[in-house]
Amino acid sequence: MLSIEKITQLAKENSTPLYIFDKDELADRISSIKRIVGDGVTICYAMKANPFLLDAAKKLNVKFEVCSPGEFSICERENINMSDIVLSGVNKEKHDIEHVMDNCGGVGMYTVESVSQFELLNECAAKRNITIPVPVSYTHLTLPTTSR
């Protein structure tokens, strides 16, 4: 954890307001979570949380949850390994999915929130003759958001 002295020093050396991220604290938290949940669980860092911590998170053996074209673009720019991307979110447009598949092929993971999304992913993958990993979740079957 950053000390008050270090924070004060950074504030004096830089203009304020100032955002300070403790990368060691991030590493400690992720390590702690991994110890608690065990090896069989994959930790995903939500890009929307803070894309400025990508470089630090890349070193922590996590996957990256990407919900928008902008977040995917950041991953591309930062050379995130495409096998570490989980394409998530309810607003995956056809052209966005096609862009990801054209750049990643069957690498990465795609989540599905509806039957229509499944059909769209299937159509895009079939057009490219690729197989994509899609985890099936039974946790939300009774929610209204799971309908077409």
Regions found by a protein language model. Name each.
Residues M1-I132:
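A charged N-terminal "starter" segment
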Residues P133-Y138:
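Short beta-strand segments
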Residues T139-T145:
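Conserved small/polar residues in nucleotide/adenosyl-binding loops
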